[in-house]
Amino acid sequence: MKILFIRSNPVNPDSRVEKEIATLAKAGHDVMLFAWDRASDHPILHTEELFGEYKVNVYRIGIKSVYSAGFKKNLRPLLKFQVAIHNFIKKHKDKIDVIHACDFDTAFSSFFSKPRKCRFVYDVFDYYVDSFSVPESLKGVVEKIDTHIMNKSDAVIICTEERVKQLRFSTPKRLIVIHNTPMKLVSMEYESSNSHKKVKIAYVGILSYGRNILETCLFVSQNAQFELHIGGFGILEPEVKKFAEENENIIFYGKMSYAETLSMENRCDILIAFYDPSVPNHKFAAPNKFYEALMLGKPLIMAENTGMSEVVKKNDIGSVVPYSSPQKGFMELLERKADWKKMSEREKKLYDELYSWNTMSERLVKLYQDLKSSNSR
């Protein structure tokens, strides 16, 4: 099948999109990607890029906007992107059997622009009104449209079983769960903490508020026995860079590929996934860091009452602390250094039995096999 993925970031990197595209390309589908480059203004640029071992046609449009700046500040760029989606689909309508829309900010335009016989898969990374700063006056309207699209889609994908609770008004024709779990791209041999003196903390992701980024930087700057390895991009990047310049135990990597991320995390001791539980969507979050910690066998620190924190607590594979007390998690795991090896073994077992990408990719391939079969009837 000819599949068009649409994403509201440049997919450079975007681990979930990359894995899904690679999986479908491997299964024999002809996949192309339309993505939003927010760094600068430019017309659509076409490149051929490798996703796994497979070449994919990628189209990126540049519409300058600011990550994590909120709905109001990015409204104009968002509207421009909606128009760009419509125009792109119209131009390539004969090359599309299925539109795979990632989140509401691509689903809105693509659903109402899709060719009549085109199938529609709605991949809900984050439930929009619970995740983004949508003005109160618009939330009801946005949720109604979102629900309509879910109900009319050929399939809806969510990233954890818990997310079903968010789809409170919708009744999708088909609903499947694909966890944000990584493929095994690097050696996963457990690295003993005795191989280096400092406790190495790893974080790679969006550098924005609501994730205890600056709080972690401050803690590490004041505690020489720890070392923070941090990568990513976002609104807090200048402040993170400043911490790194002023503290030799904070190392900033900037934007990293997914393979680089996993490799760096594998050289560290502890992963963190702090999300502010006051944000409704964070209660259902499925952080990449959770799955990466399982696959790599690294103890994980999470905030209480956020997605997957109960799994960490139940299986004793890290530390779960109040969001306002990240330092408690660091000190708790430092004191439990002797338990890290056992935690690692439990994590890898969980990954293999419940969350492996092999299992997730089988679900995705089966979905598209079924769509293809129903198309040929």
Task: List the predicted regions and their residue ranges.
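Nucleotide-sugar donor phosphate/pyrophosphate-binding loop at the beta->alpha transition
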Residues: R76-K80, C118-V121, V129-H148, K184-S187, ...
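Membrane-proximal helix-turn-helix segments that form the acceptor-binding/catalytic region
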Residues: V83-K90, F108, F112-R116, Y122, ...
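A short, well-ordered alpha-helix in the C-terminal region of glycosyltransferases
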Residues: E332, D339-L354, R363-K366
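Nucleotide-activated donor-binding/catalytic signature segment of Leloir-type glycosyltransferases, i.e.
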Residues: P238-E265
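N-terminal strand-loop element at the rim of the active site
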Residues: L4-N12, K26-R76, R163-R168, V177, ...
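Nucleotide-sugar-dependent
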Residues: V11, S15, R211, S257-E265, ...
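Donor nucleotide-sugar binding/catalytic pocket of nucleotide-sugar-dependent glycosyltransferases
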Residues: A35, V129, E143-E189, H196, ...
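Conserved donor-binding/catalytic core segment of Leloir-type glycosyltransferases
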Residues: K2-L4, I157, S193-S221, L228-H229, ...
